[in-house]
A protein has these predicted regions:
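Short alpha-helix in the alpha/beta-hydrolase fold that links the catalytic acid
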Residues: 217-218, 375, 389-398
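C-terminal catalytic histidine-bearing segment of alpha/beta-hydrolase fold enzymes
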Residues: 394-445
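Cap/lid segment of the alpha/beta-hydrolase catalytic domain
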Residues: 208-280, 337-345
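Hydrolase active-site cap/lid region
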Residues: 246, 309-356, 409, 419-420
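N-terminal cap/lid segment of alpha/beta-hydrolase-fold proteins
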Residues: 37, 41, 150-194
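Short beta-strand element of the alpha/beta-hydrolase
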Residues: 197-209
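Short beta-strand/loop motif that positions the catalytic acidic residue
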Residues: 373, 379-381
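Acidic catalytic loop of the alpha/beta-hydrolase fold
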Residues: 383-388
Length: 445
């Protein structure tokens, strides 16, 4: 159990000029700034953990300090009155694997960066394991799903798409019929004069939602991916089989009607579980990509953020042709976190009651599917991400069969990077985004 200072006694001292830790991390809040003694927020059992509050004269007289374990359990909630200065507000010894979230700000700020400073820590992430175990027939189940899908001959409809981003790249609107549900839809692009067997494949999957710009395939994005390295076969596949390039009212209507609340739809079995066909569309897209004569026959890189990370993890687990994967704060990784007494991953409806869905969800949980993947892997987790908790991401990472894998944590990252203050985003770009981009660029050279 972590050791906590007696705050009443401690706060008799209005200010203590503690030396800045050599690897201190900082979060932004206009009135106060939290700081921890670990650059990446990762600790081992037995390590000392310290949290300071740097209080400005603009800080309101009364602030609330909270400590939460595994994004479920408040272990400390205390009102504080601090004079301007730097104050040690928490100290202890890490005694077990756990994710901590520290919040200092206005009462009831609820992790709002505009009202509080927030920082996270994770202890012994390498020991964390998923809530669900792999079903004995996991491989057989997906092999049967692929066999049924492939009974339908692979056909593709390609429509040239004019683009001005790179004159050396050709781009097409892509549609591939499926035996069930919506077709695969997206864009494919590659260099005009590429040699046979010269290009890797890169597939982008999209985050959750329907009408948002982040949910839709973009010509600019696929052309940019096709231009990477010495050129690639780039696919940008949307999650739902939506038409590309439609007026916004088309996507608004889908979100309000046919696809409303899709991530929390109930189901009776595999057949009506929405994510089954979402994952199969990813495989079908790859089935098409590997038929292109420009493919080098070896490299397949897939990446995505949030729900896109779920799709990327699924494809890496289901399909051994995937050789490298980048998972960015991935969703649907350890939805059964409650089995380990921690918050489970998105989708929230399923993680709130993992026992109810235990006969179906293990076949789709990325933490389970990654047990079948030997792909080279780079994974990112945010230590204050309540949508895709870092303990869940760590559990999935640990469960991956890959022996060439890297995970990075960032102590101030919530689920959406643009919610971090500007100075923190700059640090994140240097410490997380830069190595993430290098991982991709090195692989695609």
């Amino acid at each position: 159990m972590i050791i906590i200072f007696d705050m009443r006694r401690f706060l008799i001292c209005a200010f203590l000029a503690w030396a800045v830790a050599p690897f201190a991390s900082f979060a932004q809040y206009t009135a106060a700034v939290l700081e921890i003694n670990s650059k990446d927020g990762v600790y081992a059992v037995g390590d000392s953990i310290k949290v300071w509050a740097n209080v400005t004269p603009e800080c309101e007289a009364v602030q609330e300090f909270t400590v939460q374990e595994d994004m479920l359990h408040d272990i400390l909630k205390q009102e504080m009155r601090l004079a301007p200065g730097r104050h040690l507000v928490y100290a202890g010894v890490c005694s077990k694997p756990v994710n901590y979230v520290f919040t200092f700000g206005k009462s009831g700020a609820d992790r709002d960066y505009k009202k509080a400073s927030i920082v996270g820590a994770i202890v012994a992430p390498e020991t964390m394991r998923p809530g669900y175990k792999a079903p004995k027939d996991l491989r057989k189940f997906w092999d049967n799903q692929l066999k049924k899908m492939r009974k339908m001959p692979l056909e593709s409809k390609l429509t040239p798409v004019p683009q001005e981003y790179n004159p050396d790249i050709v781009c097409f609107d892509l549609e591939i019929p499926m035996p069930e549900g919506a077709p695969v839809r997206g864009y494919v692009a590659y260099p005009k004069n590429a040699d046979l067997k010269s290009l890797p494949i890169i597939i982008m999957a999209h985050a959750a939602g329907v009408k948002g710009g982040w949910c839709q395939c973009k010509v600019e994005s696929v052309v940019k991916n096709a231009s990477r390295g010495k050129g690639t076969i780039a696919l940008d596949i949307n999650a739902h089989g939506m038409l590309n390039g439609q007026p916004q009212k088309y996507y608004d209507s889908l979100e309000a009607n046919e696809l409303k609340g899709y991530s929390s739809w109930d189901f009776t079995g595999h057949k009506d579980f929405y994510f089954r066909l979402m994952y199969l569309r990813m495989v079908r897209a790859l089935d098409y990509a590997v038929t292109l004569p420009q493919w080098d026959g070896e490299r397949v890189f897939v990446y995505g953020e949030s729900q896109g990370g779920a799709q990327a993890a699924a494809l890496a687990g289901i399909d051994s042709r995937v050789t490298a994967v980048n998972l960015r704060v991935p969703a649907f990784i350890d939805v059964a976190g409650l089995y380990q007494n921690r918050k489970g991953s998105w989708p929230g409806k399923y993680s709130a009651d993992p026992k109810k869905y235990a006969k179906i969800l293990p076949y789709y949980d990325g933490a389970v599917l990654l047990s079948m993947s030997r792909a080279k892997m780079f994974v990112e987790a945010g230590l204050v991400d309540y949508t895709c908790p870092p303990s869940c991401v760590a559990a999935g990472f640990n469960n991956a069969a890959s022996t060439d894998k890297t995970i990075v944590f960032f102590p101030y990252r919530p689920h959406h990077e643009n919610r971090m203050p500007k100075d923190i985003r700059k640090r994140w770009s240097e410490e997380v985004k830069a190595p993430r981009e290098k991982f991709r660029e090195d692989y695609l050279q």
